[in-house]
Design a protein with these regions (language model features):
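The feature marks the mature, well-folded catalytic cores of soluble enzymes
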Residues: 1-113, 120-365
Length: 365
């Protein structure tokens, strides 16, 4: 049962951990919607097997499937690719799409050393932000219920995200945290008053207050816009990511003639003002961006910042681009405790997202 609005995660000692902290599992949604990848669905399924192959050795994989028939299909693909199924759990939950980062459960964890109510025993819980298809698409009703299914399956407390009597809309790809209290997001995604408006009438101060209550953060920093072609309208996980508590990578476009040059340059100006939760300045590492990719005349949101940090590996989207090697080298230096692996994402990005968009971490207790 969802908690009443006054019992927020922060009030009960919960906060969102960083992605590099230990996971119990990674959540994925087996691809089934042909409109996301026209004519490419089987190709995408093979990419999923590669994703699971690298994640499963270090943690469980919880795979949402539309039906038992889809489960059989997923098992067939994974088995043929040599992926052991011992650590793969299949959960039947019909979905509209497979972008689990945005519609899936957002986990928070309680600091066991923090004094809270004796009634709060669980170390982890789920926040149900109310997915609405990025305020763009009409088919989201099945996706919205994924956090409820996750809470029942795991027997976790479910916090119903509301603010001033309204359901609060947020996607996992629209935020990034360092696990110490600082959260990154963008104005394009959550403050644009005209385009893909998630929470009409809620301004900067109200959204910051809501983020602090439901994710347990103390410090919110706003970047400007995202990359061209991002149909979510400015998700931060395509431009700027924490890689440890005091370091971020920030995407940079060096070609003044590219449409991404100006908004990304503005973010580099803004990042100078970023202070962490303790008032210190973070280290900022430049991450390149691949050359322009188009399909049917549309710019695709190809970005190396859409990597996913699993327990034993960091999965990085690659695009048959000379900058693939550069990005892998930069991230390899930043994640020396994990294998940094390139995952071919030219087909994935046709659906306007890649690795981070598909995955959602479940932290260890």
């Amino acid at each position: 049962m969802a908690e009443p609005p006054q019992q927020t995660p922060a009030a009960l000692g919960f906060s969102m951990p960083a992605e590099w902290e230990p996971h119990r599992a990674t959540w994925l949604g087996w691809p089934h919607n042909p409109t996301d990848w026209p004519g490419k669905l089987d190709t995408i399924r093979w990419v999923y097997t590669e994703i699971v192959r690298w994640i499963a050795p270090g943690e469980a994989v919880r795979m949402l499937v539309n039906s038992r028939t889809e489960e059989k299909l997923a098992r067939k693909f994974l088995t043929r690719a040599g992926v052991g199924l011992r650590r793969v759990e299949f959960i039947v939950h019909p979905t509209n799409r497979g972008w689990t980062r945005d519609s899936g459960p957002v986990f928070v964890r309680r600091n066991v050393g923090q004094a809270v109510s004796p009634a709060v025993r669980a170390k982890t819980a789920i926040v149900h932000f109310h997915f609405n298809g990025w305020a763009k698409y009409s088919d989201w009703q099945k996706d919205r219920r994924v956090p409820e299914t996750a809470a029942r399956r795991l027997r976790k407390r479910l916090f119903d995200a509301q603010w001033k009597g309204r359901q609060l809309v947020l996607e996992g790809g629209g935020i990034d945290v360092n696990g110490r209290g600082t959260l990154l997001t963008t104005e394009e995604c959550y403050l644009d008053p005209k385009t893909q408006v998630r929470n009409p009438g809620l301004g900067r101060q109200e959204l910051e207050a809501a983020l602090k209550e439901y994710l347990g953060v103390t410090n919110v920093f706003w970047l400007g816009g995202g990359v061209a072609g991002d149909d979510t309208h400015g998700h931060v996980d395509d431009i700027c990511r924490f890689v440890n508590p005091t370091t971020v990578v920030l995407v940079r476009e060096d070609n003044p003639g590219d449409i991404n040059f100006r908004p990304l340059a503005e973010n580099w100006e803004r990042i100078r003002d970023l202070r962490l939760e303790d008032g210190s300045k973070p280290e900022v590492v430049a991450l390149p961006i691949p050359g322009p990719l188009f399909f049917d005349g549309n710019r695709l949101p190809a970005s190396y910042a859409n990597f996913y940090i699993a327990n034993r590996a960091v999965l990085v989207p690659t695009f048959n681009d000379p900058n693939d090697r550069v990005a892998l080298g930069i991230l390899g230096e930043l994640f020396k405790d994990r294998a940094v692996v390139g995952i071919h994402a030219l087909d994935l990005v046709l659906g306007f997202g890649t690795l981070h968009c598909l995955t959602q971490q479940e932290p260890a207790d």
